């Protein structure tokens, strides 16, 4: 009898060419499917994820699922997978899921975080885990700008021009930045995110924090629907897929408002 297994995994994206399998490159999906292939005595097991992450991007709460005929408890799955996965991937949680659960299509919202180190001196021990932006920033102006992203908008100005997705309307439930000493942490919760959307928003809001732009520019950019008018794409290493929400929309709202 086949069962569907849901896992929450974390990974350090530094030495991966992204999540999705690519020929000749090291990827998170490739490493995970290789472990499952060994556990299934050479049979390929396909893994589905909540979404793809690019090279250098990290995850604390990526969600995946796969179907298997093996009869193991959740704890046995967790131990067996972690015993064979490389050190830069860890399975944090395992449970048997309903047959109609899908890591991507059942998701109601996602949370991304982005970390920025703002000290004058670069921290060599953090260089793979946050962007470095050694400039004086006005946090209140940045949060004023981020609040303008709340609600449902066309985010064309904040997605890569390379995207092939035509529907670029998304709902942003939460967008804010907090400072803990020289470390900034942006938090975004939304119904979905376009390619490079978080990184372009961060790059634009950092310019607002420096005084190069006004917070009101966010509304202008949303209306313009033109990627060329927004700020630069922030580096990959500061980005984390933090959590995927599968609860109903009302619960998502209560979670992000709390």
UniProtKB/Swiss-Prot annotation:
Source organism of the structure: Geobacillus kaustophilus (strain HTA426)
Role of this protein: Formation of pseudouridine at positions 38, 39 and 40 in the anticodon stem and loop of transfer RNAs.
CDD domains reported in the protein's UniProt record: PseudoU_synth_EcTruA
Isomerase among keywords: yes
GO MF term set: RNA binding; tRNA pseudouridine(38-40) synthase activity
Protein name per its UniProtKB record: tRNA pseudouridine synthase A
Assembly with partners or alone: Homodimer.
GO biological process, alphabetically ordered: tRNA pseudouridine synthesis
EC top class, as a word: isomerase
Pfam families linked to this entry: PseudoU_synth_1
Family statement: Belongs to the tRNA pseudouridine synthase TruA family.
């Amino acid at each position: 009898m086949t069962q569907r297994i849901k896992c929450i995994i974390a990974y350090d994206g530094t030495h991966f060419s992204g999540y999705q399998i690519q020929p000749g490159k090291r990827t998170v999906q490739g490493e995970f499917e290789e472990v499952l292939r060994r556990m299934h005595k050479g049979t390929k097991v396909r893994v589905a994820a909540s979404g793809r992450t690019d090279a250098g991007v990290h995850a604390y709460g990526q969600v995946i699922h796969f179907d298997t005929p093996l009869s193991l408890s959740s704890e046995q799955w967790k131990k067996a997978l972690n015993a064979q996965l490389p050190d830069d991937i860890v399975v944090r949680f395992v449970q048997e899921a309903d047959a109609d659960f899908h890591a991507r299509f059942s998701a109601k919202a996602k949370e991304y975080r982005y970390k920025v180190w703002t000290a004058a001196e670069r921290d060599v021990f953090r260089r793979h885990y946050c962007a470095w932006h050694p400039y004086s920033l006005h946090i209140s102006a940045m949060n004023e700008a981020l609040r303008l992203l709340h609600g449902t908008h066309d985010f064309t100005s904040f997605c890569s021009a390379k995207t092939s997705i035509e529907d670029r309307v998304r709902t942003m439930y939460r967008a804010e930045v907090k400072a803990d000493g020289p470390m900034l942490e942006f938090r975004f919760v939304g119904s979905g995110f376009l390619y490079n959307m978080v990184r372009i928003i961060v790059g634009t809001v950092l310019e607002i924090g420096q005084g190069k732009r006004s917070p009101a520019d966010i509304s202008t950019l949303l209306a313009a629907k033109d990627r060329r008018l927004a700020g630069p794409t922030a580096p990959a290493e500061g980005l984390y897929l933090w959590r995927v929400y599968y609860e109903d929309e009302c619960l998502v709202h209560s979670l992000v408002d709390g």
